[in-house]
Amino acid sequence: MLILGGGIAGLTAALALAAKGHSVTVIEQGAHLGGRMWHAPPPVLLEAHGATWSLIKSLGQDAVTRPLRHTPLEFLQSTGARIQFLHLPLPSPLNTLLGTTLFQGLSMRDRWHLLSFLERTWEQDPPLPNDLDSRVADEWLTSIGQSETARHGVWNSLARLLLGAPLEDISAGLFMRTLRRCFLTGARATKLIVPPQGVDSFLLVPLTRELDRLGVRIKLNATVSQVRFSPNRVTEVEFADRTRLTADWYLSALPPQRLTPLLPERVVTHYAYFQQLSRLSESPLVVVRLHLDLPARQTQLILLEGKTFHWMIRHPDEERHDQTSVVWALAVGEPSLLPQSTEELVRLAMDDMAAAFPTAEPPRILDFDVMRLASAMLASKPGTHQYRPIATSPFTNFLVTGAWTDTGWPANLESAILSGQRGAEAISAQL
């Protein structure tokens, strides 16, 4: 079995297939595995992320997460007010009703309108509109009585965290489904865990170690130039150096803009499955990691309103020294930040950090990293859902996976892992 792409989706599929005794080779054009998750910040884990927790457990990383406490979700509003969303250990819907009632980030009027909407939703009177996937989230929130202050503050901050874009750029349907899954389905669902490690240390290292134990072959710095097809099957892949590989099954774990150029033009033009990939677009991401000479007692996640960066994570530096801490500053959907110099991005991150985590004296930076991704995640625009492909393609031995495929989730870590699992299951079901 040949897997194109060594990101999380491809590695998850490789793990599932190799665990069942199949011979698997992973092709990665980069110098390392992990794709966009290489050097990514700590994952924001909710109980609703079932596929992610399944992978964590299979890798033995639940030993890391088990002792971790709930990480409160904080909002730093443009007024300077700090609001915390309460995690209440109560059964659903009581936890949702009480949590919404007590949440100070929304005015009493906004809370009342939200509770009225939730009550109608639970009773399905009236049923939810059928066109939410094609509507803009900002317009939909207005229609259920959310004020401009609420939309530009709390809801916009959540939209950037969960879907990677502001309200005016995302699908109302996907936003509502994600909110419901993450925050409105019981006390366990709202428990939030942020491990004090980046994705590479927390997931990629143990995942790579397990793949090596299972005998999965990894080919790094290997650039595929073309996927070759017969009338109903993939027959081989050709590399830039003209060498070729064949397999019984092929699974793509590439982003759409890298997959399409590998396909013959006749395949792209003939099959709507591949043709519609051109309708998908991606959003940029900028991440600044600051290693500081200031200790942190616990992990914090704070959403920022009206700042350069949209949220920050601070956690103790458990990998190097307990008297230091690490701060991650993230900005999504802001292409204007990409050409900024490294020094300027670090300065902007320090400015936002001073507001998010005020101290008597500015901490000293021990070291830092800046990551710029022009195409980081699928843009969740209205109407995008209909163009996200399922795992099974028109060709019997060719599967397509990735966070951007149709998983029901935004293009996040959960979506990547779930798509990899589904791709592996689709292959196993036919063997």
What are these regions (language model features)?
Residues M1-A9:
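Beta1/beta-strand and adjacent pyrophosphate-binding region of the FAD-binding site
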Residues A18-H39:
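Glycine-rich FAD pyrophosphate-binding loop
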Residues K20, A222-V327, A331-E343, D351-A356, ...:
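Mid-domain catalytic core of redox enzymes
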Residues L33-A48, S116-F117, T121-D125:
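Glycine-rich active-site loop/strand segments that organize a redox cofactor
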Residues V44-G50, P129-D133, I144, G186-E210, ...:
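Short beta-strand to alpha-helix junction loop
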Residues T52-W53, K57-A172, M176:
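Mobile amphipathic helical/loop "lid" adjacent to a hydrophobic cofactor/ligand pocket
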Residues T178-D241, L245, W249:
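Helical element adjacent to the flavin cofactor pocket in flavoenzyme catalytic cores
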Residues I302, K307-L431:
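Conserved flavin/dinucleotide-binding core of flavoenzymes
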